[in-house]
């Protein structure tokens, strides 16, 4: 009984911390984008505009949340929750430090990959539930994008799994005590970055919402907190992908002098900032270009990386 209560308290604390982290990251993103574009960015609410995310949250909560005529009411309401819930569940197996994970499971990598994939279903569900044609096109793009990136995203981390000899998040981190896997798996890290951006539906792979040609894509008809939940899921997905990348390629909590959780947080912040830099620097490709790159470039590279890594691992383990 006490163990269940303690687990509930820790889980609630983690969820609240993640919600605050997602809000703070929106401020960080806007400030970094402003710096890249040589403008000020948010600077009115709080010091350096730090409390802007609080004001935006209050504004979204206060807005009316309507269901447009012709929408599937059940699916329309369910989609925003599906966007955020799997990402929060994914953080449950992330190892923030030595013996510091909400749930230590032997197949943590597979669980995280599955949770990341579920976010695409929220996009498709919201698009199909909406009466807008723009939403439908955005949902179709999301489905095709999911099929394209999931294939090489899973293969990109397979080399790390073979070297570490485990699917456990903690064991993968411990296997990097001598050298980070970014050194041994640079191709896998690059492919994981591409797939992670696509999984989070971030620029330049935000084609399901693509404001230039689809108005707002799958979220065209959403307002109020339903709209906010989609964006909460997106920003949480960025943080989850960053934490996943740190675990797989950058040594997780390992580092000198500072405590492990601090190292993990710093590394995750740097990777998340890199995603913002990519958004500021790269244009959005055409939809057909993105799909072509995934199937004809990224997937063959991922397969080649797996084959080469497998040969090396077998050769090193041979007597």
Curated annotation (Swiss-Prot):
Segment forming the signal sequence: none
Membrane topology term: Multi-pass membrane protein
Example GO biological process: aerobic respiration
Catalytic reaction annotation: a quinone + NADH + 5 H(+)(in) = a quinol + NAD(+) + 4 H(+)(out)
Any single Pfam family the record assigns to this protein: NADHdh
Disulfide-linked positions: none
Keyword ATP-binding set for record: no
Record-level Gene Ontology MF annotations: NADH dehydrogenase activity; oxidoreductase activity, acting on NAD(P)H, quinone or similar compound as acceptor; quinone binding
EC number: 7.1.1.-
Gene Ontology cellular-component terms listed: plasma membrane
Transmembrane regions listed in the UniProt entry: 5-25, 78-98, 109-129, 147-167, 179-199, 214-234, 238-258, 262-282, 294-314
Record-linked HAMAP family: NDH1_NuoH (MF_01350)
Family per record: Belongs to the complex I subunit 1 family.
Quaternary structure and interacting proteins, as annotated: NDH-1 is composed of 14 different subunits. Subunits NuoA, H, J, K, L, M, N constitute the membrane sector of the complex.
Name the UniProt record assigns to this protein: NADH-quinone oxidoreductase subunit H 1
Chain's gene name: nuoH1
């Amino acid at each position: 009984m006490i163990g269940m209560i303690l687990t509930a308290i820790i889980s609630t604390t983690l969820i609240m911390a993640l919600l605050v982290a997602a809000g703070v990251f929106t401020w960080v993103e806007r400030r970094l984008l402003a710096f890249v574009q040589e403008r000020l960015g948010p600077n009115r609410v709080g010091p350096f505009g730090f409390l802007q995310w609080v004001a935006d949250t209050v504004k979204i909560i206060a807005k009316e949340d309507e269901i447009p005529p012709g929408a599937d009411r059940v699916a329309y309401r369910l989609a925003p929750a599906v966007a955020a819930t799997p990402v929060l569940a994914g953080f449950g197996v992330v190892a923030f430090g030595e013996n510091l994970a909400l749930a230590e499971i032997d197949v943590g990598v597979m669980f995280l990959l599955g949770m990341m994939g579920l976010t695409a279903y929220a996009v498709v569900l919201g698009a199909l539930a909406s009466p807008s044609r723009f939403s439908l096109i955005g949902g179709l793009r999301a489905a095709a994008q999911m099929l394209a990136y999931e294939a090489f995203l899973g293969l990109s981390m397979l080399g790390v799994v073979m070297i570490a000899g485990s699917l456990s998040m903690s064991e993968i981190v411990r296997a990097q005590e001598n050298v980070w896997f970014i050194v041994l798996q640079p191709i896998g890290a690059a492919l994981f970055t591409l797939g992670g951006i696509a999984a989070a539906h971030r620029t330049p792979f935000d084609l399901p919402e693509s404001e230039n040609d689809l108005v707002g894509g799958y979220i065209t008809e959403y307002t109020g907190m339903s709209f906010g939940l989609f964006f909460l899921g997106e920003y949480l997905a960025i943080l989850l992908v960053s934490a996943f990348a740190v675990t797989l390629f950058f040594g997780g909590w390992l580092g000198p002098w500072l405590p492990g959780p601090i190292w993990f947080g710093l590394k995750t912040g740097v990777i998340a900032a890199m995603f913002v830099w990519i958004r500021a620097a790269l244009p959005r490709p055409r939809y057909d270009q993105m799909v072509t790159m995934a199937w004809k470039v990224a997937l063959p590279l991922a397969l080649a990386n797996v084959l080469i890594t497998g040969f090396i691992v077998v050769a090193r383990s041979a007597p």
